[in-house]
């Protein structure tokens, strides 16, 4: 027995060493990240992330405080990201990534209320090929957001005086104003104007006028312009100005699985927002996309706030808050590629068509696809992917498990990935301060949009498209429930039919016997609206609008010129019943075209 005793200490040391390698929590402060140091800690936090991957730690903890992150020392990596930039707008797809999580499983980043303060133009965090990652209770902001804010202070014929937000950096050069940031200058700008009296976000040419006018600084942060006499903007309104080039994104989740963002606060996102691309099972829990309350800013995103492209499994968005987007707060879709050439009986050459979406993996071996007629948006055949070969950034060759349909029209019809389509739940959210839509969603799987508030979205609060000739984003929906939501004064900037809810597929051939969308139910909602149009529906079968309340307000003057509450085009088996009108009752409630009388059942006379 004694001859084995000398082995025991060695075994104990081995066990202790192995146990040390599997510690549960890693602290960024142990790697030199110091809160409130205002020094660049990108390499220190990245080292802590890498340690989690090496040891299998379950928690990465950031003690409360502010941590500054600069591009210097950050990871640079090429990513092709959906809906971002063309080859001409941004030839390089290399992103500057603040924090990189690559092939990491079962990790919680516990923010403890800490703030990551970014500098320059950066993609704040990237998750690539991760599984079971959770980001919790973290704030993300930029020292100098790429969106500038300029408030009209005094306006007289020929002179306009403005106040620039303290986070907006500017310079007067040769009598003209320039906007710049930390390592960048704003060149190609898009402008949205905010009216605090009406709480509306409208398109504006105000920046074009100011930037072309002679300017002089009369005090720090106050600039006076010599403007045309007819230029008379409203004093107190604010211009939100940002560069149109989407060269970075707010946060990027690529080809990952089981990702949760909880109590994450995104106070500014440059380019595009939180982009989830070909990822399975994503939960957004109490995520807030809005400026810090103490910042005095209006803008939180240059474009979309949450963008889901080609995802699958479940997308759950619960109790989130969206305010200050210059595009859509939530956008869920896939990507249709056009069939260019038949290589052999089972192989097609396909092309990414939209300028801003290309280069990423759109198909994977084993995926089920549908062949889609662009003119009608019909899915007319299916197949399974056997092999994918990248030819160029725009072109891929895909081999299928069966012969390509003989009726496929090359250079017109498309191929849709049906596997990479998610179920979607959007519940208990608040949408406001956007010039565009609140929610865009196209997926053939189940969609529930329930108990949300849409407050003064500039265009339709909810838009359901299906597109194989414009953005090339997805095909028909089959199961959508819109229930228990409140819509308040939406669509003042327009949208399909100026309607609060718009169902607007891109099909050019409208035939009620060949509908695009199916089974859309709109029930128990309240619409408080200044204009008449509530529902615009095109090419939809099984449309139900039941037990909804419509209240006429006087917030804005009616702008649509459309006296109809409901406009149905090419729909089949539509039902409108149980509608309660409060206030003014329109004399002309329903307009139909390209459909038979029997295809609408209604209790409205």
UniProtKB/Swiss-Prot annotation:
The keyword NADP does not apply. It catalyses: Hydrolysis of terminal, non-reducing branched (1->3)-alpha-D-galactosidic residues, producing free D-galactose; Hydrolysis of terminal, non-reducing alpha-D-galactose residues in alpha-D-galactosides, including galactose oligosaccharides, galactomannans and galactolipids. Gene3D superfamilies: Single-stranded right-handed beta-helix, Pectin lyase-like. Keywords: Glycosidase, Hydrolase, Repeat, Signal. InterPro entries: Beta-barrel_GLAA-B_II, Beta_helix, PbH1, Pectin_lyas_fold, Pectin_lyase_fold/virulence. It holds the Pfam family Beta_helix. One of its GO terms (molecular function) is alpha-galactosidase activity. Residues 1-20 form the signal peptide. Its EC number is 3.2.1.n1, 3.2.1.22. Belongs to the glycosyl hydrolase 110 family. A subfamily. Alpha-galactosidase that specifically removes branched alpha-1,3-linked galactose residues present in blood group B antigens. Has no activity toward linear alpha-1,3-linked galactose residues. This is Alpha-1,3-galactosidase A. The gene is glaA.
């Amino acid at each position: 027995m004694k001859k084995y005793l000398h082995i025991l200490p060695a075994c104990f040391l081995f066990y202790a060493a192995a146990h040390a390698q599997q510690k549960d929590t890693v602290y960024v402060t142990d790697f030199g990240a110091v809160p409130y140091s205002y020094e660049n800690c990108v390499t220190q936090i990245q080292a802590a992330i890498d340690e989690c991957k090496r040891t299998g730690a379950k928690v990465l903890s950031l003690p409360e405080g502010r941590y500054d992150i600069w591009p210097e020392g950050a990871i640079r990596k090429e990513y092709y990201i959906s809906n971002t930039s063309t080859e001409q707008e941004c030839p390089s797809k290399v992103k500057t990534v603040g924090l990189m999580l690559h092939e990491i499983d079962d990790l919680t980043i516990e923010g403890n209320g800490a703030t990551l303060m970014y500098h320059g133009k950066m993609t704040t965090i990237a998750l690539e090929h991760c599984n079971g990652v959770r980001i919790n209770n973290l704030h993300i902001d930029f020292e100098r957001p790429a969106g500038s804010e300029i408030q009209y202070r005094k306006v007289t014929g020929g002179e306009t005086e403005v106040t620039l937000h303290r986070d907006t950096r500017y310079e007067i050069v040769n009598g003209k104003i320039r906007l710049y940031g930390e390592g960048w200058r704003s060149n190609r700008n898009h402008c949205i104007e905010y009216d605090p009296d009406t709480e509306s976000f409208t398109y504006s040419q105000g920046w074009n006028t100011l930037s072309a006018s002679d300017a002089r600084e009369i005090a720090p942060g106050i600039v006076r312009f010599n403007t045309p006499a007819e230029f008379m903007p409203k004093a107190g309104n604010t211009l939100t100005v940002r560069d149109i080039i989407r060269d970075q994104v707010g946060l990027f989740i690529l080809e990952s699985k089981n990702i949760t963002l909880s109590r994450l606060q995104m106070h500014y996102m440059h380019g595009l927002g939180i982009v989830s691309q070909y990822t399975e099972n994503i939960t957004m829990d109490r995520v807030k996309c809005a400026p810090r309350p103490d910042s005095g800013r209006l803008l939180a995103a240059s474009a979309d706030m949450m963008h889901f492209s080609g995802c699958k499994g479940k997308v759950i968005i619960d109790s989130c808050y969206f305010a200050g987007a210059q595009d859509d707060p939530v956008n869920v879709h896939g990507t249709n590629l056009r069939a260019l050439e038949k290589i052999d009986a089972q192989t097609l050459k396909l092309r990414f068509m939209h300028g801003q979406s290309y280069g990423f993996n759109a198909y994977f071996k084993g995926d089920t696809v549908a062949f889609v007629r662009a003119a009608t948006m019909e899915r007319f055949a299916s197949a399974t992917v056997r092999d994918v070969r990248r030819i160029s950034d725009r072109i891929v060759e895909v081999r299928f498990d069966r012969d390509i349909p003989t009726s496929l029209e090359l250079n017109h019809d498309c191929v849709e990935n049906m596997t990479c389509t998610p179920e979607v739940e959007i519940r208990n959210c608040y949408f406001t301060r956007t010039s565009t839509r609140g929610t865009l969603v196209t997926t053939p799987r189940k969609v529930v949009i329930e108990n949300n508030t849409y407050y003064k979205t500039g265009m339709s609060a909810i838009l359901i498209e299906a597109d194989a000739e414009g953005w090339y984003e997805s095909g028909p929906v089959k199961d959508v429930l819109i229930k228990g939501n409140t819509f308040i004064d939406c669509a003042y900037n327009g949208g399909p039919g100026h309607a609060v809810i718009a169902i607007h597929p891109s099909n050019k051939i409208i035939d009620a016997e060949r509908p695009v969308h199916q089974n859309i139910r709109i029930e128990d909602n309240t619409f408080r609206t200044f204009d008449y149009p509530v529902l615009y529906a095109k090419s939809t079968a099984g449309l139900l609008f039941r037990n909804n309340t419509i209240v006429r307000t006087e917030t804005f003057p009616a702008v649509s010129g459309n006296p109809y509450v409901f406009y149905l085009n090419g729909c089949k088996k539509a039902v409108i019943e149980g509608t309660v009108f409060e206030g003014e009752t329109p004399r002309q409630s329903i307009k139909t075209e390209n459909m038979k009388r029997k295809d609408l059942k209604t209790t409205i006379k």
